[in-house]
Amino acid sequence: MLNHILLLVISLVCAALTLSWFPLLFRKQSYSCAKGLIVITGGSGILGHAIIQEALDRGFSVASLDSTEPASFLQYNSKFSALKCNITKDKDVEGCVHSLKKMNRTPFALINAAAIAPKNHLLSISRQELQKCFETNVIGQLAITSALFPLLLQDPNPHVVNIASSLAYFSAMGVGAYSSSKAALVSLHETLEEEVLSQHPNFKFSLYVLGQIKSTMFEKDTPNRVLAPLLEPQNLAKIIIQNLYTNKSGRFYYPFYARFMPLLRFFPLPIQKLARLFSGMDKIYS
């Protein structure tokens, strides 16, 4: 019991220090990655599309790995390449890596923006839906990261970007599959970062923990615009690309409330219930 209390105290202190010294979590160097190649998954999504457009506007080259066709106007941009790829299928992943090698394209950054969010209660969701969610949001992202890893290492400052959700820390009714997959992604990111940096200290990892984005993935509005404002995908894209441009990495939380979501887990259950009631988070997809 004493060990559990000590662990709780240490966790709270670490969380407080994280919030107090938040700016120190970022590693920034003078190296600029302008004109390099960015590989992105999920480019047909609202956020993925915004990231592609912002990257092209900033002078980067972009290779989009997606199972659907890109917007027609992107196909006429000489710096844009579209590779049809389902990241949940090993053959597709291997084929995309082979195509990049064949084109003599070496990426400096990978942005994992692919995600799906089934809406169903956990006792009602099918095994197939749950499996597809984890394959897309977790397993597939690790697969493409692993496959591109040798190519990324050819750049002096390689960078992997993963996009999580504030729901990974405090889930809501009706989106349990999505939330748990994003929680797994957070754990995967943290472990992968430590494993890679132990051997390749120049490698960069960035984790973006986001609230609700204006997109078709979560078409229903948030119940409390003051506490949980909707995020504009274009604004997020500017932040992500700017951080790549300046070689800044670390943990990024948007909007402001997202950085406090992990702390809710340490509060007594009645307080958590009040937070759910006050925010209305369980009413959206219940």
Curated annotation (Swiss-Prot):
One of its GO terms (cellular component) is endoplasmic reticulum membrane. One of its GO terms (molecular function) is oxidoreductase activity. It is an enzyme of class 1 (oxidoreductase). Belongs to the short-chain dehydrogenases/reductases (SDR) family. It is found in: Endoplasmic reticulum membrane. It comes from Schizosaccharomyces pombe (strain 972 / ATCC 24843). The active site is at residues 166, 178, 182. Keywords: Endoplasmic reticulum, Membrane, NADP, Oxidoreductase, Transmembrane, Transmembrane helix. It is a multi-pass membrane protein. The chain crosses the membrane at residues 5-25, 36-56. This is Uncharacterized oxidoreductase C16H5.14c. NADP(+) binds at residues 47, 67, 178, 182, 213, 215. It holds the Pfam family adh_short.
